[in-house]
Amino acid sequence: KLLNKLKLGRKKIFTYSDHSTVADRNNIISQFDKGISGGLISDAGTPLISDPGFKLVSDLILNNVNIISLPGPTALITALAGSGLPTDKFQFHGFLPKKNKELVTTLNECSNFSGTSIFFETPHRLMASLELIDQILGSKIHLCVAKELTKIHENFFRGTTKEVLKILNEKKELIKGEFVLLINFDEKECDYSNADKLFENLESKVSIRDISKLA
């Protein structure tokens, strides 16, 4: 559709995904060996940022193909800029882990980072994830949940985890679309020595039913 809109005519298009094989990449690389130019585009956001393409770009570089990276939209930067949380240092983790123990380990790692940690989350897991985060971390974090960025229903929810949960519980119709979670730890409050202790804390506070929501 984009090519037609730009009146570029029918071009050779290769579909590339996380399931693409070495043979698929070699086929694409062979096109560049013929002297053609090409581009990697995404349906949404920026290629390689929680999007396929890392192995392809790496292989292209190994084959001396010149890579030109163009600035484009990415939800994590848009969310960070509008979050009100520190922007001088940040780290991006992709989607929150599905398994509760992995989530605890990740949060434990984030508690040792003196910047803002950024995650993507799906609408059907959002509330369960926030409830677990609240059980584990309570008031030890500053939270921002960004929704449907750059779209008509864009929204930012800021505050403690409890405050954000209250808003979303009262307006469940808002739990739709794409979400970015941003967490900044209050260094004065946080003192977790390891993930195992944090996981034990989780098990003592959260029911098996609640934990299973993330499984």
Question: Residue spans of the language-model regions?
Answer:
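Class I S-adenosyl-L-methionine
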Residues: K1-I68
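Short, hinge-like loop/turn segments at secondary-structure boundaries
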Residues: K7-R10, S30-F32, L56-D59, S83-D88, ...
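Short hydrophobic/aromatic-enriched beta-strand-loop microsegments
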Residues: R10-S17, I67-I68, D88-G94, K140-V145
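Short, acidic/turn-prone active-site loops that include or flank metal/cofactor-
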Residues: I13-T21, P73-T74, G94-K99, E148-T150
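A contiguous loop/helix-start segment that scaffolds small-molecule binding in enzyme catalytic cores
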Residues: I36-S37, G115-T116, F120-A215
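General beta-strand structural signal in soluble alpha/beta enzymes
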Residues: S42, S69-G72, F119, V145
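Class I SAM-dependent methyltransferase SAM-binding "motif I" and its flanking Rossmann-like core
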Residues: K55-F113
